[in-house]
Structure formats: C-alpha cells, structure tokens
Amino acid sequence: EAQRLGLRIVSHMRSKANEFSERYNHNFSVLATPAEGLSGKFTTKDRKTFGSIPGITDKIYYTNSNHVPVYYKCSPRHKAKIEGPYHELTRGGHIFYVEIDGDATHNPQAIADIVDLMDTNNIGYCSVNHNRNRCMDCGYEDAQENLEVCPTCGSRHIDKLQRITGYLVGTTDRWNSAKLAELSDRVVHK
C-alpha cells in the first residue's frame, strides 16, 4: 500500500514537471534529492506537532528520498525492486545504494550482480557501500566492520573509510546527529 501511494505521489509530481516544461518551454524535472539536513529537522518539528509516533517520529531522522529505510533487512534484489520504479520518475537525479559486507575489492562478482540488478530494474545510478580500513602506521588494510586495533602492528591509529551522504569520509566528527543515527542503523543487504 505504501509503495502504491509513493509511486502515485511521485508520478503526479512527474506529470506536473512535464506539464510545466510544455507550458513554459523550459526544462522541469523531479529530483530524488537526499536533503540530508532536513531528515533530522523534520522529525523534530513533526514530533512537536504530532507527538511521538512509533516507527515514524520516534526516530531522530526520516529516511530520505524514496529509499528503503537503512535499518530494513532485505536483499539487494528486493531493495532494487522497491526503489527501481522511482528512478524513471525522478530523471533529474536519483541513487540506488547497496550496503555489502566483506571486501568488495576481492569480490568483483558481487559488483557485477548489483550492476545486473540495476539493468533489470531500470536503475540509473548506484553506489556500493562497504567498509574500508587502513592502519595509518603500517598500511594494513581490510574491510572489517569494527576494526579498532591493527592485527599487524597493534596500532589504534585506524582510518575508517565509509560513504555517507555521497561522500567518502574517514571520520564522522562533523556529521549531524540525524546522519550519525542513520549510520548506526545501517544494515547489510544480503
């Protein structure tokens, strides 16, 4: 039911963009923008207005765009099936991302499978997220989720590379509380 409603709303927006393009002889489009700062601001405002609603305003952030929530455990195939139909409607920009575990640099088939999902589900743009750690003292690298101590030299000077909000970052020190909460809620798509 939520999927049908979401597609109906975004289809209406797409129709209006097409109508305005014809009427004004300018390009109008629908963009599935992340609006990262708003995901936390809107929950705060909505909680003040509507109170705490389980599964909605009780979180510190809203899932942005038309993504499956980051904490929803599902396969990449299921995620693509849900999110793919929106890509044709949001031609101004969109992204499909998949969280994978393990070391993607040594698993090209996992990447190829995700590219096949993109093709099958008419997905225009994708990111594959996975952990990448590097010891800043000896150069050891791996893809463990919570590496704190280098197994080679014992150093705690570990650079943790992650993709957040479209950027590869080694630290989350400057991210707002909503983005940090979202990051901690992320699950691997298996």
Predicted segments with their positions:
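Long, C-terminal-biased catalytic regions of enzyme "large/alpha" subunits
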Residues: 1-190
